[in-house]
Amino acid sequence: MNLTGQEPRTQTRFVVLGAGTMGAGIAQCLADHGRWVTMCDTDAEALVRARERIATSRQTLETAGLQTAEQSREGDQRLSTTTSLADAVAAADLVIEAIPENLELKCRVFAELDRLAPAHAALVSNTSGLSITRLGQSTNRPGQVAGFHWWNPAELVPLVEVVSGESTDPQLVEQLLELATELGKQPIHVRRDVPGFVGNRLQFAVFREALHLVAEGVVTPEDLDRAMTGGPGFRWSFLGPLQAADFGGLDVFHSIASYLWQDLGDADSPPPLLDSMLQAGTLGTKSGKGFYDYTPESLNNLTERRDRFLQGLKQLVDFTRSAPASTADDDTATAKPQHRQPAA
C-alpha cells in the first residue's frame, strides 16, 4: 500500500470515521490536498453539520489568502459522505478513526473495521493519547494499526503525531509521516506508545501547574493565560522548550531547576479545583462557562479571532521555514538536535 506520491492521489481511497470537529477538519485537509475522501458517521445530521463547517472554514481560508476558490471547489468534489460504515470502508486504503475518546468504544469500532475493511487497509486513530497497542490487539492486523493524532483545528494546526504501537509496521509509520508532510503538516514520530503521546503530555503538564497556581491564589486565570501567550507560548511557536533552554543557557536553567524542581509537586490525581468545576457542570466553552464566561456571540467572536490568528501564524511560519538563510552557513532554524543518553 502506498499512501503518498502524485499518482496515488487519484487512486488511494481515504475514509474518515466520525463527522465531529476533528473528523471534519481532517477530511477537509485531505480533500483539499488532492485526496479522495469518504467521511462516515451514523448520524446523518452530523454529516450535514460537518459539510457546513467545512464550507465555512474554506471561505475563511480563501479570505486569508491561504486557499483559492478553485481549490475549495475541487476539494468539495473529492469529498463524499455516507452513514454506512460497510459502504465507506469496502474499498478503503486508509481509515482514520475520529470518534469520541473512549477506549472500549474505539476497540469495538476497530474490531468492526478489521472485519469490514480490505485486508491491505491501514487502520489509524486520531486518539489524543489512548493505547495504540490496545487498538491493534482488537484487530487481526496490529501491524497495520497506528496513531495519527491531529490537533484542533485540524485544517490549521501543523502538528500531527504518528504513533507506533508495539506491533506497528515501520513502513506504515514512514508512509504516514510522508503523507502528513505532503498535507502541509509538521509530523513527529512518537516511538513508544505512552499515554497522551507527546503533545498532550506537555500540554497537561502545563495545565496541571496552571490549575495549581490559580487554585493557590497566585494568579488569576486571565493573568495566567497572559503569562503563557506573552511569555513561553510566544517563543514556543518557533523554539520548542528544549531549544529555548539552549538559547537561555542550560546553566541558567539548571540553576533555576535546582530550587524550583522540588516545588513543582508530585500529585497523582486531578486537582480539587478541576473536580469541583466538573461537578458544577462548568465545562468550558461547551457549557458557556469555565475559567471564563462565554455567550454564543462572544464564543463565535473569539473563535473567529483565534482562527484568524492561527492563519496569520501559519502564513508566518510557512514563510519563515521556506525563506533562505541569510548566509550559506546559517543553520539556526534547522539546527540538528544532539541526542544525549542520560548519565548513568
PLM regions: where:
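Helix N-cap / loop-to-helix initiation motif
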Residues: 43, 68, 169, 219-223
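Amphipathic alpha-helical segments at domain termini/boundaries
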Residues: 3, 14, 28, 34, ...
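NAD(P)+-binding Rossmann beta1-loop-alpha1 motif at the extreme N-terminus of oxidoreductases
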Residues: 1-60, 64
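NAD(P)-dependent Rossmann-like dehydrogenase/reductase catalytic/cofactor-binding core
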Residues: 2-8, 185, 216, 221-344
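Structural/interface elements that position substrates and couple domains in central-metabolism enzymes
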Residues: 38, 199, 203-209
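Rossmann-fold dinucleotide-binding core
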Residues: 122-201
